[in-house]
Amino acid sequence: RASGQRILVTGSGRLDLYRFGGDSLQGRYHLLRLHPLSVAELGLTTANDLRDLLALGGFPEPYFAGNDAFARRWSREYGSRLVREEVASLERIVDLGTLELLIGRLPALVGSPLSINALREDLQLAHRTVASWLSALERLYAIFRLAPFGAPRIRAVRKEQKHYHFNGAVVPDGSARFENLV
């Protein structure tokens, strides 16, 4: 590092959005996407190691703490900060409580096709609102969506995407949590 060089490390997805904003940060920052720790990065070799990763999640703080209670508390705080600070600063959302309900509903749906229409009906919101909130969660690296692999057999039938969480510890079902990890 050069003398006098200053580095800012942030855990926010907001820096990624500066590319689309009015202020130019050209040459003043480098965007690095840090994903949760993987099996290979941790050098896991036993089934117990894998169980710990599945139970605690791949984020460094809860994983290295090695404590289920700490991991649950960290996960709750992460979700709350995501809604109250990150999403609220990027989107004009009037009803943060309903957004929290959406975020609370999503982990149970990992591994199955994500129907925006079903979520819309559950939350009594407009389709556009739910789609916008899901996009905001993607931009902030809370979730990511994968489209089905392969060409559609019938053009009129469009398959829904599946979604997964960067914080896999929030997924309640063991098999879905394993799918989320992979």
Regions found by a protein language model. Give the residues of each.
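Conserved beta-strand termini and adjacent loop/short-helix elements that scaffold enzyme active sites
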Residues: 10, 34, 146-148
